[in-house]
C-alpha cells in the first residue's frame, strides 16, 4: 500500500563524486557530493551556494570531477562533515561540520597534476574528468531557496580512465562489469550488485550515441 510521505531528502541513489578545485592560495580543495547528472560530455552539479567548492568554481571556472569506486569509500567518508569554508556556515555547524583545509591529507588521497585544468586529479579514483564551467543557475529563483542551492553545468574536456575497468579490446568503452561506482542512497554508502537483467538498450553500439560535444576539445 502506498502512503503519502514527505522525506526531507530525496537521495534515491546516485554515484558519489569527489570535486577538486583550487583555493585562492593555490592549495586544493576536495569535496564529496552525489547530486550529479551526466548528459553527453556535460555534467550538471547541484551544490550548496555557501560551499568552498562553489566559491572556487566561480572564481576559476575549473574543477576535476573524480569518480571513486567502492574501494575508496573509507577515504570519502573521512571527508564527511568537513568544509573548506571558514568560518563554518551556521547551517553546517548545526549538522556537525568543521573546518578542514587539508582535504587530500584528511582523506589520505593523492593529488596528481591535471593536463588541461589547474585543479589536481585524485590518483586513487578510477575515473577523472577535467571540466570547465559553462553555466550557473540558481534553484528556486526568486524564492526562499535562491542562493542556497545552485546548479552548475560543467563541460568535460578530458577523461582519464584506469585501464583495468575498460572493456576488453575497446579503449573508449567502460565495462560495467568491472566499474563499481560508490553509490550514495539516503545518506548511506552502497555498491552495485550483479547485473539485474539483460538490457535491450545495451545492444545499441555506444558509438551511435556520439555527439559533437564528445570530441576532445582543448581550451581556447
What are these regions (language model features)?
Residues 1-220:
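Basic, polyanion-binding surface patches
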Amino acid at each position: 500500500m502506498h502512503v503519502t510521505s514527505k522525506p526531507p531528502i530525496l537521495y534515491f541513489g546516485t554515484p558519489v563524486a569527489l570535486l577538486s578545485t583550487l583555493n585562492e592560495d593555490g592549495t586544493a580543495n576536495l569535496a564529496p557530493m552525489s547530486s550529479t547528472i551526466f548528459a553527453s560530455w556535460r555534467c550538471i552539479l547541484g551544490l550548496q551556494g555557501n560551499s568552498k567548492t562553489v566559491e572556487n568554481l566561480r572564481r576559476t571556472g575549473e574543477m576535476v570531477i573524480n569518480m571513486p569506486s567502492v574501494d575508496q569509500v573509507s577515504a570519502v567518508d573521512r571527508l564527511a562533515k568537513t568544509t573548506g569554508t571558514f568560518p563554518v556556515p551556521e547551517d553546517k555547524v548545526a549538522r556537525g561540520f568543521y573546518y578542514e583545509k587539508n582535504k587530500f591529507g584528511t582523506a589520505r588521497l593523492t593529488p596528481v597534476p591535471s593536463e588541461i585544468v589547474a585543479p589536481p586529479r585524485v590518483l586513487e579514483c578510477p575515473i577523472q574528468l577535467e571540466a570547465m564551467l559553462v553555466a550557473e543557475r540558481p534553484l528556486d529563483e526568486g524564492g526562499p531557496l535562491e542562493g542556497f542551492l545552485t546548479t552548475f553545468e560543467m563541460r568535460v574536456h578530458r577523461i582519464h580512465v584506469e585501464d583495468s575497468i575498460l572493456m576488453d579490446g575497446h579503449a573508449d568503452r567502460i565495462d560495467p562489469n568491472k566499474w563499481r561506482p560508490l553509490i550514495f542512497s539516503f545518506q548511506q554508502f552502497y555498491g552495485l550488485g550483479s547485473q539485474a537483467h539483460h538490457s535491450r538498450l545495451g545492444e545499441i553500439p555506444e558509438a551511435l550515441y556520439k555527439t559533437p560535444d564528445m570530441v576532445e576539445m582543448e581550451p581556447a
